């Protein structure tokens, strides 16, 4: 008998930055990948050409989230992992609706993972002990808070807590962990002054790039024991 086909890894928000890097990493390993995307960046076509299944999704409504889940179910009978990378970064600003800001942050960071984890759990289960994974991408601000991004920080804190609840619910078949990054890589338009200020906030004084996160994801996927934990990738910021 031949080996069973590899189950795809689902990455939400796979069109940019860390999500895009993770998608290419697994594709380079010849592992099937499904990505969600909101905006048709040129990178999405590159992922298609590399072999990824790319599904446009609107996570701003529960209906959009559940419709995406149905598309995933119609694409594959099983999943190796779900990496919840889709995110938005919205600040409280004068003249904007505070309730709308909070609702938007909760929708993308809490409702989407919550509904997708429930909707897709059967695709992750049934493959053996610790054979499935869910990884939530939270944020360093969960630990320290943020005076300019209160709703964002609160929504990521809810996602962090949800990690432990889903770990309890889905063990031992599925491991559920979180990664809390800070300043992994800069944007192209970040000026030199901003970059230096950001680097000074950590003990390690670098922006390590996507590989630091990719290596941690690889570790979590290969572990048969680690679940319900949050892994800080912040260069020692809390110690400053």
Regions found by a protein language model. Give the residues of each.
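Rossmann-fold scaffold of SDR-type NAD(P)-dependent oxidoreductases
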Residues: 12, 79-87, 109, 136, ...
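Conserved glycine-rich cofactor-binding loop
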Residues: 15-17
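Conserved mid-core segment of classical short-chain dehydrogenase/reductases
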Residues: 66, 87-103, 126, 148-151, ...
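Amphipathic alpha-helical dimer-interface segment in Rossmann-like NAD(P)H-dependent oxidoreductases
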Residues: 70-74, 108-129, 167-168, 172, ...
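Catalytic Tyr-X3-Lys loop
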Residues: 98-115, 135, 152, 159, ...
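Catalytic loop of short-chain dehydrogenase/reductase
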Residues: 125-158, 163-171, 183
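Short, small/polar-rich loop/turn modules that mediate ligand/substrate recognition or access, typified
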Residues: 173-175, 227-228
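C-terminal substrate-recognition "lid" of short-chain dehydrogenase/reductases
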Residues: 209-233, 238
């Amino acid at each position: 008998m031949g080996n069973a086909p590899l189950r795809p890894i689902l990455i939400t928000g796979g069109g940019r930055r860390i999500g895009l890097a993770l998608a290419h990493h697994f594709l380079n390993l010849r592992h099937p990948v499904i990505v969600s995307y909101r905006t048709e960046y040129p990178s999405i076509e590159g992922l298609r050409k590399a072999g990824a299944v790319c599904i446009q999704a609107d996570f701003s409504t529960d209906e959009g989230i559940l419709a995406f889940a149905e598309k995933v179910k119609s694409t594959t009978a099983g999943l190796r992992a779900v990496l919840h990378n889709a995110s938005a970064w919205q600040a409280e600003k004068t003249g904007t609706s505070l309730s709308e800001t909070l609702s938007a942050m909760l929708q993308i960071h809490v409702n989407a993972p919550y509904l997708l984890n429930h909707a897709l759990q059967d695709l992750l289960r049934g493959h053996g002990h610790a054979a499935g994974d869910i990884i939530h991408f939270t944020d360093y601000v969960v630990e320290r808070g943020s005076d300019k991004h209160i709703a964002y920080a609160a929504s990521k804190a809810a996602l962090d807590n949800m990690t432990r609840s889903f770990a309890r619910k889905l063990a031992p078949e599925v491991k559920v962990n979180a990664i809390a990054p800070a300043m992994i890589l800069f944007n192209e338009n970040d000026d030199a002054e901003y970059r230096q200020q950001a680097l000074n906030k950590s003990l390690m004084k670098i922006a390590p790039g996507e590989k630091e996160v990719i290596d941690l994801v690889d570790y979590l996927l290969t572990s048969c024991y680690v679940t319900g934990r949050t892994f800080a990738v912040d260069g020692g910021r809390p110690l400053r």
